[in-house]
Every structure is written in structure tokens, then in C-alpha cells.
Amino acid sequence: MEHYRAIWISDVHLGTPGCQAKYLLDFLKHNESDTLYLVGDIIDGWRLKKSIYWPQSHNDVVQKILRKARKGTEVVYVPGNHDESIRQFLGLSFGDIRVVPEAIHTTADGRKLWITHGDLFDGVMQYAK
């Protein structure tokens, strides 16, 4: 089992047939961290609005993340454009997962990293809504 100070995961797109949920679940089972950052497009709300696709492996990923949060991993969710509906819950916590518009991570040597989803800088996405 590997342990890291922080792990960043983005663009998983749970809810789509192309999602590699089994690989992600295997990664989550073999890697621990003090903080787990979910940096947007974890769930593909755009796809789920069109048709429901949610196999057991996608549910298993969500359950694994919730278990990590319950066991003490700080889980921070920064929504992206495909899971933008979650932005209505900014500032709240769900199952010990904090939903925030952005985050700051401090590295071991004291540097600060700003964490946000790139759709904020995508002019096409900003005007496509």
C-alpha cells in the first residue's frame, strides 16, 4: 500500500460507458493519502441527463471515496463543468466530503498550489451555457 500526502483525481466521468471505474477502484484500493482532491468531472452529469448509465463499478468508486473520507482522509471536491450541478452545494459537506469552488494545497516545502477546474478559463464553455 502506497501512502501520499495528496492525490489529485479529475475527469473520471462516472456515468459514461468509457469511464475506467475498475482501474480507478484498484488505484484507490492500493493508494492512501492524507488529502484526496477530486478536481472536477468526477460524475458526468451531462451524460446522465441524456440517459442513465451507472454500473456497479461506478457505485463502488463512490462508496470507496466515501469510506476513505469516513476513515480520516480529507476529501475535497472541486466541481467541474460536467458535474456543475454540484456547485449548488459549495461550502457544504456530504459524507465528510467538502464541496468547494477552489482549494489551496500546501506542499511539504511550504509552497502553495491553487486547485481549480479548468472550465473557468474555457471561453467556449463559459458561453455555451
Q: Where does each model-flagged region fall?
A:
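Active-site-proximal beta-strand elements of phosphoester/diester hydrolases
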Residues: 5-13, 112-119
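Proteins with a high burden of low-complexity, intrinsically disordered sequence enriched in S/T/G/P/A and R
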Residues: 11, 46, 125-129
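Active-site-proximal loop/helix segment associated with metal-binding centers of metalloenzymes
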Residues: 115-129
